[in-house]
């Protein structure tokens, strides 16, 4: 069994669902995952509106709206994909694997949508996210990523976010 710890499938799912397609994982990705013997995924919630991303077409949406949309698309895909099971722990992943299904951890890649509303971290947790990166490549209210000023690092708000995420 192979675990793909950083999968951008949710990005593709969301892009296609917003264009009117459904059953994206089943129709476009399941056979590739089987062929590659992928038994587990780390699905990234990435909603940064880069100019070359499909999110640029939704420039009127803030980061949290994009996050909610991606989660709605993910939930719809789960309903269409009984072979894919979201998990929160390694024990759950082993159970799903033993049942012959594919497990998926949810990860947040860049927390720009949190802004200064740290209660949104709890919403990520309710959705099942157990992995969170404060930045993608950008600089946001929590921290400076690879594309930000290296002198800025983790902000005070970012420190509080880390404390909350460790609970």
Where are these regions (language model features)?
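N-terminal hydrophobic targeting/anchoring segments and the immediately downstream early-domain regions
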Residues: 1-156, 160
